[in-house]
Amino acid sequence: MVKKILIVFGTRPEAIKMAPLVKIMENRNDVNFRVCVTGQHRQMLDQILNIFDIKPDYDLNIMQENQDLYDITLKILCGMKNVLNDFKPNIVLVHGDTTTASVTALAAFYQKIKIAHVEAGLRTYNICNPWPEEANRQIIGVLANIHFTPTVKSAENLIKEGKNKEGIFITGNTVIDALFYMTEKIKNDKTFKIKVLSSIGNEYKINDNKKFILVTGHRRENFGEGFLQICEALKIIAINNPDIDIVYPVHLNPNVQKPVKMLLLNISNIYLINPLKYEEFIYLMSKSYFIITDSGGIQEEAPSLGKPILVMRETTERPEAVEAGVVKLVGACKQNIIRESQKLIDDQDEYEKMSKAYNPYGDGRACEKIINILIKGKNNESI
């Protein structure tokens, strides 16, 4: 019997990591699948759908101004009920730790539909950090039947929690599949590369003779005092290193925009630019000297590009990169951010040690493994 699989995502990071799965399924005749998007990140989500040429079968279009997690949860739960009743899938595929993923898993559970969780088993075991993501992924972990983990450590987390070993599969992370897809496209498609360079050039002129630090920040737990500390640190780094640029694509959330513009707007070597399209960000990341971020996905991507990463969080659910030496936790602490950034700028040995291009998150074949398991099951047996 041909499996009916519903793929659900709603944010830009989810879309990036699920897109390679969708593209592979499009070329297979042994699966009946549909794509549902919630629109949790409307504008940024649509950019990813366009670049990967994905046309959703269902769009809940939930995003409205000033809505909170209660609003998002209610809209997704009610919307998914209608989608599940219409398509009647055998398996619902969700990704990661978003509200879209956790509420979709709950909706599927209510209809006794099997749930497959991509990027399963990540844990900080601090329910409030990151918030609400840690709670989301633990909720999905309880509800899911099939767990696709990116690493051995994430699989071990699930086993320690008492999850059924027969439902746990180590596949690597699909974000590496997406990264390789996009870097190859930029490399081999000259027209596409010219378009990417032209678009970036409208925001920041890359100079191969000048180093730049790439910054991203958007985590809820850093709102308020955390972002003030981050911005103060960036300001001091910029002033102390006038020969190095800081490039910061600023998230659209007002909680990010306000402190960033208040503290960083008029510093000559800090470039506050608009959020970038995925392909533009990948290229900018590949050209950067190092990266300061609170993003989970960048912790997974940057090691493949040989970029040191300073993570502005107290904990990480991706300890493999820390253990590999390519990621260092600095928190939202001004002194830590300044100290570790200056070390990478001044100490070539430290930079070389962190920039070794070893990625513990996979070989770019995670999607292929996931689909084969979904279709055939373990040892070619149906799930």
Curated annotation (Swiss-Prot):
InterPro entries: UDP_GlcNAc_Epimerase_2_dom, WecB-like. Its EC number is 5.1.3.14. It is an enzyme of class 5 (isomerase). SUPFAM superfamilies: UDP-Glycosyltransferase/glycogen phosphorylase. It catalyses: UDP-N-acetyl-alpha-D-glucosamine = UDP-N-acetyl-alpha-D-mannosamine. Keywords: Capsule biogenesis/degradation, Isomerase. GO terms for molecular function: UDP-N-acetylglucosamine 2-epimerase activity. Pathway: Capsule biogenesis; capsule polysaccharide biosynthesis. NCBIfam families: wecB (TIGR00236). Non-hydrolyzing C2-epimerase involved in the biosynthesis of capsular polysaccharides. Catalyzes the C2 epimerization of UDP-N-acetylglucosamine (UDP-GlcNAc) to form UDP-N-acetylmannosamine (UDP-ManNAc). Belongs to the UDP-N-acetylglucosamine 2-epimerase family. This is UDP-N-acetylglucosamine 2-epimerase. It comes from Campylobacter jejuni.
